Design a protein with these regions (language model features):
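Cytosolic-side transmembrane-helix boundaries in multi-pass membrane proteins
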Residues: 172-179, 183-186, 245-248, 260-306
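Short loop segments and helix-boundary regions at transmembrane helix junctions
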Residues: 32-37, 78-121, 212-215, 227-248
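Membrane-interfacial amphipathic/re-entrant helices at transmembrane-helix boundaries
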Residues: 1-23, 51, 59-64, 126, ...
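Alpha-helical transmembrane segments within multi-pass membrane transporters and channels
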Residues: 27, 60-100, 105, 148-149, ...
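Transmembrane alpha-helical segments in multi-pass inner-membrane proteins
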Residues: 199-203, 209-275
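Transmembrane helix-bundle core of multi-pass membrane transporters
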Residues: 91, 95-160, 190, 214-215, ...
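Membrane-embedded helix boundary and interhelical linker motif in transport proteins
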Residues: 31-86, 133-134, 239, 266
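Helix-loop-helix "hairpin" substructures at the membrane interface of multi-pass membrane proteins
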Residues: 76, 137-218, 222
């Protein structure tokens, strides 16, 4: 094991972590803000990349392609929202149904299981080859970091508006929100649309970065997103109390996840076990608060002092 091999691979892992960090922020919005487990992510993570690649191949600019990808993701979130709120289907099952439908949609969009986009023929915003030895303004890490800062600023502003506060209230206490006259169904649909729009945007960047879109590129995306959320909260939760900083901690969690993943690969551990390791990491971090409350919390005293 050559340590230089690991050091050379870390910038690429950081870049990939940042790209997936945008997806993780989308997962955070449904998982923590709306209190909904949205499994649409696995399908949307392919849809965004598929739309972006096909738009680029049709001659559109990279910005138009990414905007179209984001719109496609929002439509996927709209479908899940309609299944859940207006058809009464449980959120988890609604996400699975949309994810299942998106598999066929993604095949139709690309015409086959995968579609490559050549960085020499198309003007891409990010690329694997732009991680090292390029001017800083062309560096993938710098570009995606700017994206994340701008997105967090927009989300921080939005969730401070009346509509954003209604959305947060819906996730916190839907019954009280309805009593205050908030249309919780509309808020849930809107939250799912925003979340899946961010996931699709991340997918569009990932497709450019790796040079192709694949119908299976979203497999296990929800596990990666949850891992980033849980790791970010576990490490930075006691430091970052502001909403914007909490979103930033999710992006940091994604970076740490991919840095650890790269280290695991460098150590020679079988890559077939990576998904299992990811699932175990998420399970353990989710169990920690429960274990702390059950086994390590001090018993509360009842009654007055004698």
């Amino acid at each position: 094991m050559n340590i230089l091999t690991l050091i050379n691979a870390l910038p690429g892992a950081a870049a990939q972590g940042l790209i997936w960090g945008i997806m993780a922020i989308g997962v955070y919005l449904t998982f923590r803000i709306l209190d909904v487990a949205d499994l649409t992510v696995d399908g949307t993570m392919c849809t965004g990349g598929a739309v972006c690649v096909m738009m680029l191949m049709s001659g559109h600019s990279v910005w138009v392609s990414m905007l179209a990808a984001t719109g496609a993701g929002m439509l996927a979130g709209l479908a899940t929202g309609i299944f859940h709120t207006f058809m009464g289907i449980p959120a988890i099952l609604a996400g699975i149904l949309t994810q299942l439908g998106l598999y066929s949609a993604n095949l139709k969009i690309m015409g086959k299981a995968n579609q490559a986009v050549n960085g020499n023929k198309f003007d891409l915003l990010v690329s694997l080859r732009n991680v090292k030895n390029v001017p800083f303004y062309q560096n993938t890490i710098f570009i995606v970091a700017i994206f994340i800062v701008v997105l967090i600023a927009i989300l921080y502003w939005f969730f401070g508006t009346e509509l954003g506060c209604s959305l947060r209230a819906t996730g916190c206490n839907p019954n009280m929100s309805r009593a205050q006259g908030i249309n919780t169904d509309v808020c849930k649909v809107l939250g799912l649309m925003i979340s899946n729009g961010l996931v699709a945007l991340s997918s569009a960047l990932l497709a450019q970065y790796q040079g192709f879109a694949d119908v299976y590129m979203g497999r296990g995306a929800i596990v990666i997103g949850l891992a980033a959320v849980i790791i970010g909260e576990a490490i930075f939760g006691k430091i970052f109390h502001n909403f914007a900083l909490r979103l930033l901690s999710v992006a940091f969690g994604s970076i740490l996840y991919y840095l650890v993943l790269q280290t695991v690969i460098w150590m020679g551990i079988d890559t077939d076990l990576l998904k299992m390791l990811s699932a175990l990491v998420v399970a353990v971090f989710l169990a920690v608060p429960y274990w702390k409350a059950k086994y390590f919390s001090k018993p509360t005293k009842r009654g007055g002092n004698k």
